Regions:
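Alpha/beta catalytic barrel-like cores
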Residues: 1-96, 103-119, 123-134, 138-139, ...
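Conserved acidic functional residues
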Residues: 100, 201
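Short, glycine/acidic-enriched loop or turn micro-motifs at the edges of active sites
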Residues: 103, 179, 204
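Short, charge-patterned binding micro-sites
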Residues: 140-145
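Loop-centered beta-sheet repeat module
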Residues: 148-156
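Domain-core and long-helix interface of multi-subunit machines
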Residues: 152, 175-181
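Short acidic, Gly/Ser-rich segments with clustered Asp/Glu that frequently serve as metal-coordination loops
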Residues: 182-183, 203-207
Length: 309
């Protein structure tokens, strides 16, 4: 079990997802921005490993406009050495990595143009992880998508479109249950048709479910992760007090997290904390998890001095 948080470290004072307006696009602007983003990503990973935080979700904005037609720049070639160095660090310290495209990435859209944009966006995510030299345990997660007035047809369209995705994408894609439209049961049905692994979101399940116990859900989803996929990833959060249903808590509820950890023994999985204060909650969660025999991590880290390639 590894503990992680998504995209942003609020402590170290940099952002790995800096971007700019489309009208400002130019290769020099892209190079400058991406160089800064990659430097920040390295700093975040160092910080995390030193504190035994060995799961991290990389921001989708790492390479701005990478999937947009305006971007014809060979970012993989230009940043080959730095991407490889980051990948070497990730591998040497056994850090688990994921990415999560935004809610506008919809492969089951009724609009073919939206599907095509989504296909390119998913491919970009897979290419980032490939450029780092990471194996299939590094995943790209997404929601099933919209209902578009007919849930049965929309589920079928997801299955059909999944087969049209690039091989690089299918190699890394996982789907998660959401809190409004597609329950865990729906995601498991898609897995039966496609083989795509299912990531269990415990908070979403607490809102949209069919009465299934969390332990059973983790067993079912674990069975969808095969061979080189690694152990399952799980998203964890809880409801923010006084906010609309589905609002993520600003800081971890330690008692709730401790109960979650206790209830799920001995099942093993990596936990992504979708909580607003990011690394602060991750450190609190790691302090709880270190008492558990499933928790893994090692302190101390240095980046390779030379390009491993």
């Amino acid at each position: 079990m590894k503990i992680g948080y998504p995209c942003i470290n609020l402590t170290i004072g940099c952002k790995a997802g800096r971007t700019f307006r489309l009208k400002s696009y130019s290769p020099p602007r892209l190079i400058e921005t991406v160089a800064g983003n990659l430097d920040c990503l390295e700093a975040i990973l160092r910080w995390n490993v030193e504190r035994r935080i060995l799961f991290f979700r990389i921001t989708s904005d790492l390479i701005p406009f990478a999937s947009h037609p305006v971007c014809r720049f060979d970012w993989r070639g230009h940043f080959r050495e730095q991407l490889a160095r980051i990948g070497a660090f990730v591998r040497s310290h056994e850090v688990r990595i994921s990415m999560h495209p935004d809610q506008f990435t919809l492969i089951n859209s009724v609009d073919e143009a939206i599907f095509e944009r989504s296909r390119r966006e998913l491919l970009y995510h897979a290419q980032v992880l490939d450029a780092m030299g990471l194996d299939r345990t590094a995943k790209v997660q997404m929601h099933v998508g919209g209902v578009y007035g007919n849930k049965v047809e929309s589920l079928r369209r997801f299955v059909t479109r999944f087969a049209k995705l690039d091989a690089e994408t299918r190699n890394r894609l996982v789907i998660e249950n959401d809190e409004k439209s597609y329950s865990l049961r729906d995601c498991l049905a898609i897995h039966e048709e496609t083989g795509v692994p299912v990531l269990f979101d415990s908070f979403h399940h607490s809102i949209l479910n069919h009465g299934e116990d969390v332990y059973a859900c983790l067993e079912w989803t674990a069975a969808t992760w095969k061979g080189g996929d690694g152990i399952p990833m799980v998203d964890y959060s809880s409801q923010a007090a006084g906010r609309p249903t589905g609002s993520h808590t600003p800081s971890i509820d330690i008692d709730d997290f401790r109960a979650f950890i206790r209830h799920t023994r001995p099942l093993d999985f990596d936990v992504m904390l979708e909580i607003k204060d990011k690394e602060a909650s991750a450190l609190k969660a790691a302090a709880v998890a270190k008492e558990d025999e499933r928790f893994t991590g090692q302190p101390g880290a240095e980046f390779p001095a030379n390009d491993p390639a």
